[in-house]
Amino acid sequence: MNRHRPHSHRSKPASTQDQPDSVRRYRDPRFDAIAVKVFPGEHYVTSNPDEMLVTILGSCVAACIRDPLAKVGGMNHFMLPEAGGSGWDTASDSMRYGNVAMERLINDILVRGGMRQRLEIKVFGGGNVMKSTANIGHRNADFVEEYLAAESLPIAARHLRGHLPRRVHYFPITGRVMLLELARTEQEAVVRLERDYKSKIQVEPVAGSAELF
């Protein structure tokens, strides 16, 4: 008798370089779980109870979404491009990038048996770590809250804005989250990673679009 194994799915834009599986996945004995790193510009959906999703957020935001009954969930990691970049002429173009980041995550959960009305949503990040006058992090936090309100999707938990980067550990099957605010000494590496990501999305408009169903 064949048994179906829980499956997982990672999606990323073409601008994100592939990384060796050993970089993305590792056994974390502290949690007795397989840790899966979610990098900027990516989302990952799983129904594997052994997997824990991990990301580090500075100005970026992450939505952690699951259907507790279908036992499927995932995480994304994104920031909005600045309007006026070569690929983004208006603020509405910039918002479209955020819309697609959210819709792709939600749709991947729905096609795996999730139901919109059962979704449990937790959001994190949006810190003002780049010390920009544009306050990029808070703009990202505003977006994710406004998007979910417009879609009538309630937020079960949030830890947004502030001035420090965060490490998020998310267990999609149980909904458990462990969050750690990182010391300022660790901030430089986070900012460097996000600046690289920001420079890529400024010149690469998101491919395609998505609609919730």
From Swiss-Prot:
E.C. code: 3.5.1.44
Uppermost EC category: hydrolase
Ranges in a coiled coil: none
Any GO molecular function: protein-glutamine glutaminase activity
Superkingdom assignment: Bacteria
Biased composition annotated in UniProt, kind: Basic residues: 1-12
Listed Pfam families: CheD
Keywords: Chemotaxis, Hydrolase
Region (Disordered): 1-25
GO biological process: chemotaxis
Reactions listed under catalytic activity: L-glutaminyl-[protein] + H2O = L-glutamyl-[protein] + NH4(+)
Function: Probably deamidates glutamine residues to glutamate on methyl-accepting chemotaxis receptors (MCPs), playing an important role in chemotaxis.
Similarity field: Belongs to the CheD family.
The protein, known as: Probable chemoreceptor glutamine deamidase CheD
